[in-house]
């Protein structure tokens, strides 16, 4: 039977195509090992070919002129499934050249994605061959693409960006999230796929039986048994369809609203939010922040929206990932007038995502977005003007001067932006778009956003405009700390350049959760498992943290120093030095700890990092205080013990500003804002300008959170006296404007 099935020239040609496809995939990063991407590519290509071959086999074997179908089904299964050994064996052999981090996990995905896709496609072809009898391949071609089009339909017309599909299995959406944990839901969905596949086969058999009503036409169970099987299969399909929201196989807008629970409405927005998390003043401020940015963006982009924008706020990345996908990526769907944001990212992401929706007014028709991702994301960053707490032009100059910039012209092609590392791409595109807007005006840029025609609109080709922009950036000058910061932020590979990216991301996520649960021994085992696959920044940081929390300080020092000694990756491990400094501190090597922390501080990674490092330096410069607070930083793992230590010190030394500052931070972490304000107000002016800025900013933020807007303005005004970066002044001035907005607009939530 094998020889007969593969004796046709078209069948042999299909096997050759499958072989060539498999070999090509071994040369493409991310597709070159047994994982999701490889399985998805094989599923799409071979399911299409297997369907056409099934129709060909039906016609060439003269099956339409014979009564039975059992032999044909067996031969079809051989034709569709046996060739799958080709890609499976090739990708397994490729493991000798490309690391395969999880053979078992990859095999499970291959089984769940590829096999059901091929069986579904063959059943569809079988049904069409029996039912239509003419133009069968054309009908299959159209039907196959309609089924695949379901992915676009679901992700384009609904809130979710993921989709379960009979042919692809699972589509994760266009997102920067590397973690992919879908096997349990995919298994459930594939049960439905196989049930529907069997229903199509039985329907085809029934149609063929009607054509050949004679004895022995079909070897299937008796009528009552067949009806029972059909009923059972139909129940499976129906249950998965009607309960798909609850099972995590889909997520309708109504289901998302119901899950979140809360809804507020303003003149320009409908805001769905987690009612268990957002209440009172915080809810009112988030609602008004929408209107505050609406006014800003209306002026900046010269646009007024024609309908209300719907914002969905999620309690956590996990909730967002479960409901729409893209757990760690905030996103906008301009064509639906929707934003999807994790509540913890609202201050950092709301304005950026709103720009995408506003830009829909002058975007490409129907989909209402820019002509390419470089213009889409570049405009959003250009309007914000700040990225990584730096003015966007300064940061872009830093990227360019350190030769870390991606191909700038390529960023404005159809796919170039997605291929490049995300961090540098956003900065470079944002700076370039800001330059075009400032130099040539918003009106011309809005036309560019829709068309992508640089030469027509600016009278200059893109390469010439890029050279102009590079000359503009030439006026910035940087020190060694700036260069170290640039290498840390941007000397990173995209997902296509990483080994076993998804497997490692899943393991690192597990390690992060174990650390949060203070299960340090288990976290250490998990990080070692990740590091066995490949060295990554996250895993190295997590392992060092686990070693510190377990009191294994010497091991922590050796591990951190071994990674920092490698010049090729030392820049990426910059923040690992903080843990190295803490480990030195734990070993009473105060001088080494001071040196390490001071070295990181000169990079000024962010306001929060500057605050954390300045506090450490203040403490380490005072031996008595360093001994007293050492347990707080390196050995006390329980929050209650850490707080108790600080409270004892504050009672014993009520005039010690550092411990009062630390205790205030603990009060903030436990949402005891009034107590935190009392402590910070009682702290005398800090000698360090970084810490004094942090104190005043925190007082302003706390007063704002409590709805004390006039008082918040005072603190923010005072903090302007201590800024040491241009971006800090811009951020504080934005807070001042929002306080003024809240004072005049009030806290009205419909």
Model-derived segments and their meaning:
Residues 30-39, 86-110, 141-192:
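Membrane-interfacial interhelical loops
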Residues 150-194, 211, 224, 231-244, ...:
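Beta/coil-rich, acidic/histidine-enriched accessory regions frequently appended to metallopeptidases
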């Amino acid at each position: 039977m094998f020889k007969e099935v593969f004796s046709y020239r078209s069948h042999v040609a299909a096997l050759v195509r499958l072989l060539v496809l498999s070999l090509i995939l071994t040369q493409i990063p991310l597709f070159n090992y047994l994982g999701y991407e490889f399985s998805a590519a094989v599923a799409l290509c071979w399911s299409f070919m297997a369907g056409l071959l099934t129709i060909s086999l039906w016609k060439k074997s003269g099956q339409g002129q014979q009564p039975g179908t059992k032999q044909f089904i067996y031969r079809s299964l051989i034709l569709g499934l046996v060739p799958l050994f080709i890609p499976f064996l090739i990708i397994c052999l490729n493991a000798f050249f490309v690391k395969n981090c999880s053979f078992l996990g990859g095999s499970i995905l291959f089984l769940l994605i590829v096999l059901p896709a091929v069986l579904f496609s063959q059943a569809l072809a079988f049904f069409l061959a029996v039912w239509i009898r003419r133009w069968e391949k054309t009908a299959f071609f159209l039907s196959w693409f309609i089924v695949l089009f379901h992915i676009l339909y679901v992700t384009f017309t609904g809130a979710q960006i993921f989709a379960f599909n009979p042919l692809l299995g699972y589509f994760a959406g266009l997102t920067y999230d590397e973690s992919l944990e879908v096997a349990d839901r995919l298994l459930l969905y594939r049960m439905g796929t196989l049930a529907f596949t069997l229903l199509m086969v039985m329907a085809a058999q029934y149609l063929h039986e009607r054509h050949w009503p004679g004895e022995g036409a079909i070897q299937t169970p008796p009528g009552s048994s067949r009806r029972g099987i059909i009923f059972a299969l139909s129940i499976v399909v129906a249950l998965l369809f009607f309960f798909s929201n609850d099972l995590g196989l889909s997520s309708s807008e109504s289901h998302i609203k119901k899950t979140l629970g809360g809804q507020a409405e303003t003149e320009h927005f409908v805001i769905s939010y987690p009612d268990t998390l957002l209440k009172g003043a915080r809810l009112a401020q988030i609602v008004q922040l929408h209107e505050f940015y609406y006014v800003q963006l209306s002026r900046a982009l010269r646009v007024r929206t024609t309908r209300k924008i719907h914002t969905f706020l999620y309690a956590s990345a996990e909730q967002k990932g479960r409901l729409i996908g893209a757990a760690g990526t905030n996103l906008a769907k301009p064509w639906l007038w929707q934003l999807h944001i994790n509540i913890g990212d609202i201050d950092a992401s709301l304005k950026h995502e709103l720009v995408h929706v506003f830009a829909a007014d002058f975007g490409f028709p129907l989909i209402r977005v820019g002509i390419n991702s470089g213009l889409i994301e570049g405009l959003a960053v250009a309007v914000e003007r700040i990225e990584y707490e730096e003015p966007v032009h300064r940061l872009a100059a830093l990227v360019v001067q350190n030769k870390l910039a991606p191909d700038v012209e390529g960023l404005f092609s159809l796919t170039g932006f997605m291929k490049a590392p995300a961090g540098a791409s956003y900065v470079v595109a944002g700076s370039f778009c800001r330059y075009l807007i400032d130099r040539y005006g918003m009106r011309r840029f809005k036309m560019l956003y829709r068309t992508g025609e640089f030469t027509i609109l600016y009278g200059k080709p893109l390469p010439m405009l890029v050279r102009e922009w590079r000359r503009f950036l030439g006026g910035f000058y940087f020190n060694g700390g700036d260069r170290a910061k640039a290498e840390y932020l941007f000397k990173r590979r995209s997902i296509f350049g990483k080994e076993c990216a998804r497997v490692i991301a899943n393991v690192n996520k597990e390690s992060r959760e174990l650390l949060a649960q203070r299960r340090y021994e288990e976290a250490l085992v998990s990080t070692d498992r990740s590091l066995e696959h490949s060295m990554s920044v996250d895993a190295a940081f997590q392992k060092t943290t686990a070693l510190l929390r377990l009191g294994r300080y010497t091991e922590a020092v050796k591990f951190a120093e071994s990674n920092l000694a490698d010049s090729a990756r030392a820049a990426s491990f910059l923040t690992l030095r903080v843990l190295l400094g803490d480990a030195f501190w734990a070993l009473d090597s105060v001088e080494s700890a001071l040196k390490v922390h001071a070295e990181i501080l000169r990079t000024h990674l962010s306001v929060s990092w500057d605050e954390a490092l300045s506090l450490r330096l203040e403490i380490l410069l005072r031996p008595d205080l360093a001994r007293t607070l050492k347990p707080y930083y390196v050995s006390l793992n329980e929050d209650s013990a850490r707080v108790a230590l600080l409270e004892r010190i504050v009672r014993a030394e009520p005039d010690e500003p550092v411990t009062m500052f630390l205790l205030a931070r603990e009060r903030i972490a436990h949402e005891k804002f009034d107590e935190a304000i009392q402590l910070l107000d009682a702290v005398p002016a800090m000698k360090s300008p970084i810490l004094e800025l942090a104190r005043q900013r925190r007082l302003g933020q706390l007063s704002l959170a409590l709805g004390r807007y006039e008082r918040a303005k005072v603190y923010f005004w005072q903090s302007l006296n201590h800024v040491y970066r241009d971006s800090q002044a811009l951020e504080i001035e934005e807070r001042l404007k929002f306080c003024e907005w809240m004072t005049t607009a009030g806290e009205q939530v419909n």
